[in-house]
Regions:
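Charged, amphipathic alpha-helical oligomerization/scaffolding segments
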Residues: 32, 51, 55-62, 66, ...
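Single conserved hydrophobic/aromatic residue that forms the stacking wall/gate
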Residues: 1-7, 11
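Long, contiguous hydrophobic alpha-helical segments, chiefly transmembrane helices and signal peptides
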Residues: 8, 15, 26, 30, ...
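Alpha-helical rod/repeat scaffolding segments in eukaryotic adaptors/tethers
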Residues: 38-49, 53, 70-97, 110-132, ...
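Acidic, low-complexity proline/glycine-rich segments
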Residues: 12-32, 160-165
Length: 167
């Protein structure tokens, strides 16, 4: 991110002409804001990774195991009982868990690469070009997992709870 648009040039010229800030002060403020942005997004990415690894993946795996046990229990009672729904659900849950795991690995890799960057502008560009897309990919997979997992097994309030249970 570089403050090079026509509007930012106008603001920069106005602020320096009016002697509100010097050119060096504007650059310093810009770098401080970029650094704050980078730190904030990095904290969000690390939190997202931790939530997926420590809460979402275990919840999905546990729920898939419960569904598989339920299907096995039904078939133990009567071998003629078809458990197509349960089998399909377990396959979907397993696939989405694998997807989440892969995306967490990709996000962790992006976080590690970000931490090697020393220039704040390079870091902000990396966040824009790499880290945010990894976070979005993980979010999409986690949202899919939420739709497949029973509400009682999901470790967080659902969107419905957040939107409609305001008291």
């Amino acid at each position: 991110p570089k403050p090079s648009s026509a509007a930012s040039d106008v603001y920069k010229r106005q602020l320096t002409t009016q002697r509100v800030y010097t050119e060096a002060e504007l650059r310093s403020r810009y770098e401080i804001m970029l650094e704050n942005y980078c730190k904030t997004v990095c904290i969000e990415a690390q939190t997202m990774s931790d939530m997926a690894r420590k809460q979402i993946l275990p919840a999905v795996a546990h729920y898939a195991a419960d569904v598989a046990r339920d299907a096995s229990g039904k078939q133990a009672l009567d071998p003629d009982i078809r458990c197509g729904y349960e089998a399909k659900l377990v396959k979907k849950l397993t696939a989405v868990a694998e997807s989440i795991d892969t995306r967490v690995d990709a996000l962790d890799g992006a976080i590690a690469r970000f931490k090697t960057l020393s220039d704040v502008t390079e870091g902000a560009n990396f966040i824009r070009d790499e880290m945010l897309s990894r976070m979005t990919e993980l979010r999409v997979a986690a949202d899919e997992a939420e739709t497949l997992t029973a509400e009682s097994a999901w470790p967080f309030p659902t969107y419905g709870d957040l939107l409609f249970s305001v008291k």
